[in-house]
């Protein structure tokens, strides 16, 4: 069972909807988007998340009715303190795994605490993904937007309050949040410190996958995605606005809060989703199905069925397959797999893969259950059992993921990762079937 939505905040339910919300009655114009004089003396502004001529089913855009237009800002200047560079490290085909990254010792807000892990695209390209681990121990006092891509946040420790232009989201571990490219927001900590994962999607916006023969229900159901209601800040005084542009941080100083949208309508919206609401699909006969049945969100490419990025989870579930090796099978994959763990243990790894940690299996890197897991799975008396108190996830992408220089030099990189398979025995006997 899952908990009820927090009563402190209101949300709009659904995925891909044309939403509408207003913090003041009558703030939304009726029958048009850009009237000569908008209600309450507001400015009309369009935020486009896709090209104008995309098909309607894929179009993402939102009209904002705000106290001051976003164009009201001075020149952006490059910040002296830059994020850790996402420069890619040496090419390696090896399987990699990292222990959890430590929390920062110095005061660090959300945008200061990104550690680049892997990437497969330069920020200026409209495809690919960059993956980070974030760590923070103080709330943001500034506002941020990312011109380089859509952000998928996966908290592992610490609750976050995310104040966006369209309203406020609160997320905790086992929930995720998605922030559209270019949307301004501020992250406040609801606990002393926070850590988690970020997928920066440079490609097509994320959407829920088609269900095919599963039917009209299952996996992540649209009604469980929650978008905030309109909420605005009317303040005066200096506010730093930071943008990430081609991997660099640039900033300007405003004399007002840029989170001043009084009303809005459209489909280019931030949202949250509770992973505990995922309707898991699995076999009720034999064999382990392909992990695509665990897809929560996908960013497609022009090649049908091949994703720019998939977000896949491995949630609590019953294992009932008969006469079956039940862990995820040994695999060599065309896709590239970056995995993280939010809580518990992953059923293919008995040890070494910890909450807050990560692993990378690149294209055609052989992987699968470790020796201990394999031995148990082969010899166990099969009976229905539940994998519980766990939540692993995977960012899977069709382009090769290369680790960053920081990730390769990190003390948390496990030098002995390959050893988890080293004791797999040969049990072949040509005289015994």
From Swiss-Prot:
Q: Which parts of the chain span the membrane according to its record?
A: none
InterPro entries in the cross-refs: HgmA_C, HgmA_N, Homogentis_dOase, Homogentis_dOase_bac, RmlC-like_jellyroll, RmlC_Cupin_sf
* Molecular function GO terms recorded: homogentisate 1,2-dioxygenase activity; iron ion binding
Gene3D superfamilies referenced in this protein's UniProt entry, alphabetically = Jelly Rolls
Q: In which pathway does it act?
A: Amino-acid degradation; L-phenylalanine degradation; acetoacetate and fumarate from L-phenylalanine: step 4/6
Q: Which reaction does it catalyse?
A: homogentisate + O2 = 4-maleylacetoacetate + H(+)
Q: What class of enzyme is it?
A: oxidoreductase
State where Fe cation binds.
Answer: 331, 337, 367
- The positions annotated for binding homogentisate are 346, 367
Write down the Pfam families for this protein, in alphabetical order. Answer: HgmA_C (PF04209), HgmA_N (PF20510)
Q: Name one GO biological process term.
A: L-phenylalanine catabolic process
Q: What's its EC?
A: 1.13.11.5
Q: Where is the active site?
A: 288
Keywords assigned by UniProt, alphabetized: Dioxygenase, Iron, Metal-binding, Oxidoreductase, Phenylalanine catabolism, Tyrosine catabolism
Enumerate the HAMAP family for this protein: Homogentis_dioxygen
Q: Which NCBIfam families match?
A: hmgA (TIGR01015)
Q: What does this protein do?
A: Involved in the catabolism of homogentisate (2,5-dihydroxyphenylacetate or 2,5-OH-PhAc), a central intermediate in the degradation of phenylalanine and tyrosine. Catalyzes the oxidative ring cleavage of the aromatic ring of homogentisate to yield maleylacetoacetate.
Task: Kindly state the subunit structure of this protein.
Answer: Hexamer; dimer of trimers.
Q: Which family does it belong to?
A: Belongs to the homogentisate dioxygenase family.
Q: Any idea what this protein is called?
A: Homogentisate 1,2-dioxygenase
